[in-house]
Amino acid sequence: MGVARREERLRALAEEMRRSSPDSGYRVCDLSDVAAFVDLLERVEEEHDRVDVLLNIAGVGGVIRTEPVTAESFRAVMEVNFVAPYAGMLTVLPGMRRRRFGAIANMSSDDARAPGPGAGDYSASKAALSAATESLSYDVRPDGVFLHVVYPGWVPTEMGLAAVSDGGLRMPPRAVRRTEEQVSSLVLRRLGDPRLEINAAALPLVAPIMRTVVPSAYQWMRAKQ
């Protein structure tokens, strides 16, 4: 079941999914409306008797801001990137725990672990999602439910391309670039794995270490990006 706000793209996605899963479908929902997203998940679970896998991929932001972030814009980013996926988890987890089976993957960002200039709202929202997912994973793992935080590297999605074309971000090095197919294949392989993190690229793992070991050099490099 695909969920997104643009029906035309959802329709195309559903057609592709039906090639391998004939019963695939879609629902239109804007995740900025958290209550509507929760209601949708409840209806899907009621209609299909269960939700075994939830992939929270939707996101907004990721561009370098030149103007000050307002409380309203910060809240809007947090609603889509953190509140909606967290509410989605809380909606489907009771059923997963009763059945002692389930997996949830939440799309984070390397900016959550190593935030750069001009994107504090995006980085904060992804950091909140990563932290909340890890904390909750300890509670549900004994019930056979596994939660994952996905760090995809840089992917040429619409949002990723916008960030480098007019969003103020330099093209990331080749070592951290990944395709949508590479990331999705990795996530599918790792769903249900005991490991919390799903890292598509190894290089970003060095950033938090550099920040601790050589903080001055690290901050200088981040400020230049």
Task: Map each language-model feature to its residues.
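Residue(s) in the substrate-gating loop at a strand-loop-helix junction
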Residues: S109
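Conserved glycine-rich Rossmann-like NAD(P)H-binding loop of the short-chain dehydrogenase/reductase
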Residues: M1-A12
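Active-site helix of classical SDR
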Residues: M89, S125
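Substrate-binding pocket helix/loop in short-chain dehydrogenase/reductase
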Residues: R65-T66, T70-R75
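Conserved NAD(P)H cofactor-binding loop of Rossmann-fold oxidoreductase domains
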Residues: I57-G62
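C-terminal helical subdomain
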Residues: V149, R170-A207
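The beta1-alpha1 cofactor-binding region of Rossmann-like NAD(H)/NADP(H)-dependent oxidoreductases
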Residues: V28-D39, A71
